[in-house]
Amino acid sequence: MKWLSKTCIVTLILISCEDAKYSLDNPFDPENIDLRPPALFFHPPNILAGLDTSISVELYGLELEPAAAAHLDIRYDWGSLTVDSVVPGPFFKGQNSPMEIAIDEQGVLDIFIFYLPDPQSDESLAGTWSLATVYLSTISTGESELLYGENTTLVDAKNDSIQIKDFGKGYISVE
């Protein structure tokens, strides 16, 4: 009798359980951004902000090879935005913090990031990581586009260029 009771309980549990159904369509997931890796993109790709506010955008790499340095040539509408600061992301962090130089000139932000070698490595790990975060202030209303310029390059520890197949765009709408 106990055996029959246990069998009925186990049977009820098995037939009443159902696998969870998840909708895996987050537009911010790297698999859903429609870029061929290795790629560079802006996260978030679309920003809605008010006038005279501070915003941030991350410069992301999708399935990047290990790198020792980067020159990120960022184009933006300098009549609508001002660059406040740039902070290196985790892609170039090892035992030492990376060295970063940012030069902002009339809508062209040149960011140079260098991995500082340590006893274990002379370049970053591969993967999908944030290369840097750019902090901006909005100064006029309208639409602004963020682009990676033609001078954007990544190099490995031997100073060989790392191929980037695709570049995403970013959009900032200021109301």
Where are these regions (language model features)?
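Acidic, low-complexity intrinsically disordered segments
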Residues: 17-175
